[in-house]
Amino acid sequence: MRRAIPAVMALAWLAACAKEAPPPAEEVNTGHADSVAMAAEMFDTTAFDTVTWRTPDEALSRGGLVFRVSCNKCHGVMGNGDGDLVADGKSAKPGSFLADSWKYADDPMGLRKAIFTGSAQDMPYWGLVGLKYRDLDAVASYISDYLRPTFMEQAGTP
């Protein structure tokens, strides 16, 4: 009996260390959609009333940093939706910020909300996983006030 105890303990230890199978894709997608819905409920437009910048350049500088760290990998340098994760097939292609029909072109609060809540497709719900309202404001300003106009001008689109 005493000899069996170490063997049973070893088996129990090995079983505890075994990796669990990842959840089915449907569960992951449902979980992501639930988090997007939760983020939509938590989004607070009045939080932006307290965000101030010393200069517009300060907001653009911060927004550029946030974009490079959080957005560039999917949206790409110019916002065309051709970032490294898309090129590698690890993310769905997001819409282009440069498209004439871009739905947030004249909707800064809508853009902030989209960044905060993410999307059921692939976009992270940044408001729940790391970006504060100040960073959301900065990156939205960077996209709408710098990135989109700059690259549309380079493309010859007014």
What are these regions (language model features)?
Residues 92-110, 125-137:
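Electron-transfer interface patches adjacent to heme c in soluble/periplasmic c-type cytochromes
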Residues 1-15:
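Sec-dependent bacterial lipoprotein signal peptides
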Residues 64, 68-91, 117-125, 146-152:
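Periplasmic/extracellular electron-transfer cofactor-ligation site
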Residues 27-66, 156-158:
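Electrostatic cytochrome c docking/interface patches
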Residues 61-69, 95, 109, 113, ...:
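Solvent-exposed, polar/charged alpha-helical surfaces in well-ordered, non-transmembrane soluble domains
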Residues 44-48, 88-96:
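Short glycine/proline- and charge-enriched loop/turn segments
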Residues 114-146:
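Axial heme c-ligation environment in periplasmic c-type cytochrome domains
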Residues 17-20:
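Bacterial signal peptide processing site
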